[in-house]
Design a protein with these regions (language model features):
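Small-residue-enriched flexible segments
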Residues: 187-252, 262-265
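Active-site cofactor/substrate anionic-group-binding motifs, chiefly glycine-
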Residues: 48-102
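Catalytic-core signal marking the mid-to-C-terminal active-site face
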Residues: 2-7, 12, 250, 255-360
Length: 360
C-alpha cells in the first residue's frame, strides 16, 4: 500500500497553479484547469483529477496539447453547432463549448452541439452540472482518441477508450440528477490510481495481454497492455460503440481505429444534446412527476450493506463536502509523478511541495 498525503484544498490549488503555469498558460487558463481537476478530486473521482497532469505534461511536450487556444465555431446552423477545440485544454474549450450550447438552447429551446478535437475534457459530469445549473436537460456522448484501453465484448484486446455517457436532469428545489459513467466497467484512471496504491481491482474488470482474466491493474497502465472490460457485458459494449459513433465519427469526425500506443495525447469528441424543459413540457406536471418518482424510488428500504437508496450525483456531493472539510487524499506515487511533471515543465518540485504543505 502506498503512503497517502492529505492536502488542504486551498493549498492544493496554490500548488497546482504553480505547476500549470509551467505550460505557459494564461492566468484564466490556469484557474480553469486547476479548478476542474481539483473538483474531480473533491467529488471522489481521483481518476480525473490532478493525477492527469503528468499525462497532460507528456502530451504538451509532444505537441499534442496546445495551451491558450479557444474553441472555434465551424458550423452555426441555429439549433446545431459544430465546434473545434483545436487541441486546447479540455477544461477551457469544454466550458466555452457548453456556454455556447447553453445560450443557444435557452434561445431556441434545444441545441445539438458537436465538439471535436478537444484535449482531455476531464470529468464529463462537470459539463452536465453546468447544463443543469442553467435549468437544462443534457445528454453527452463522448469518445476518446488515444491508446485503446477497452476490449469489445467477446474480444481479447483493447480497441477503444472508456467512452463516457453523461446526463443531467434538473429537479425543482433540489440538486440535479447527474448520471456520469464510463462505458467500461472501471475508468482507466481508476486502474492507474489502484496501480499507484499497490491495490488490485475487482474480478471481471480486466484481461491481460493474452486475453486472460486478471485483477492486476498494471495491464491497463504499463506494457504489455491488456484491456478493461465493458460494463454489463454486451450492454456496455453497445453504449461504448454508440458513444464512439456519435461523439467520435459524427461530432468530431474522428473515431478510434489505430493501435498506436506511442502518443500521450488524449483527444475527446463530444456530442451534446441540450433541452430546455420549459419549452417542451407542462412544467407543473413535469416537476410534480419527476419529484414523485424520485421520492418513490429513494424511499425503497435499503438492503443489507446499504444505508439508503441514492440518486445519481449524490455520492459526488457527499464526497465534495467531506473532502472540502478534511482535505484531498493523494497517494505518494501519484504525488511523485506530479512532482516529476513539474520538473519537466521547468517548475521547481520543492515549490510544489512547499505550496501543498507536503514534506519532501
Amino acid at each position: 500500500m502506498s503512503l497517502t498525503h492529505t492536502i488542504d484544498v486551498d493549498a492544493l490549488h496554490r500548488a497546482m497553479h504553480l505547476l500549470v503555469r509551467g505550460f505557459g498558460s494564461s492566468d484564466a487558463e490556469v484557474r480553469a484547469v486547476c479548478s476542474n481537476l481539483i473538483e474531480a478530486n473533491l467529488t471522489g473521482h481521483d481518476s480525473h483529477g490532478i493525477g492527469m497532469l503528468p499525462r497532460y505534461t507528456d502530451s504538451y511536450l509532444e505537441g499534442g496539447l496546445k495551451p491558450n487556444v479557444h474553441v472555434r465555431t465551424v458550423l452555426d446552423a441555429g439549433a446545431m453547432l459544430r465546434l473545434d477545440g483545436q487541441a486546447g485544454f479540455g477544461q477551457v474549450v469544454g466550458h466555452e463549448a457548453m456556454a455556447l450550447g447553453v445560450e443557444r438552447a435557452r434561445q431556441l429551446g434545444c441545441c445539438v452541439m458537436a465538439l471535436g478535437n478537444a484535449h482531455h475534457l476531464g470529468r464529463i459530469g462537470a459539463w452536465a452540472e453546468e447544463a443543469a445549473a442553467a435549468g437544462l436537460v443534457s445528454l453527452h456522448f463522448v469518445n476518446v482518441i488515444s491508446r485503446g484501453i477497452v476490449a469489445p465484448h467477446g474480444g481479447s484486446d483493447a480497441r477503444f477508450g472508456t467512452n463516457p455517457f453523461t446526463a443531467a436532469i434538473p429537479l425543482k428545489g433540489r440538486a440535479p440528477m447527474i448520471l456520469d459513467f464510463a462505458t467500461s466497467v472501471i475508468a482507466q484512471g481508476k486502474t492507474r490510481v489502484a496501480h499507484n496504491k499497490g491495490e488490485q481491482v475487482p474480478p471481471d474488470h480486466l484481461i491481460d495481454h493474452e486475453g486472460r482474466p486478471t485483477q492486476d491493474p498494471r495491464y491497463s497502465v504499463i506494457e504489455p497492455f491488456g484491456a478493461i472490460l465493458t460494463f454489463g457485458a454486451h450492454k456496455g459494449y453497445g453504449m461504448a460503440v454508440l458513444c464512439e459513433l456519435l461523439g467520435g465519427a459524427l461530432a468530431a469526425g474522428m473515431a478510434q481505429h489505430s493501435d498506436d500506443t506511442s502518443k500521450k495525447r488524449v483527444l475527446n469528441g463530444m456530442l451534446t444534446v441540450l433541452i430546455d424543459p420549459a419549452k417542451i413540457a407542462d412544467m407543473a406536471a413535469y416537476e410534480r412527476e419527476a419529484l414523485a418518482f424520485v421520492d418513490w424510488v429513494t424511499a425503497s428500504p435499503p438492503r443489507e450493506g446499504f444505508d439508503r437508496v441514492r440518486l445519481a450525483g449524490e455520492p459526488e456531493r457527499e464526497s465534495r463536502a467531506k473532502r472540502t472539510g478534511n482535505g484531498v487524499p493523494v497517494d505518494a506515487t501519484t504525488w511523485q509523478e506530479i512532482l516529476n511533471a513539474a520538473n519537466k515543465l521547468g517548475v521547481d518540485p520543492k515549490k510544489i511541495n512547499d505550496a501543498a504543505g507536503v514534506a519532501a
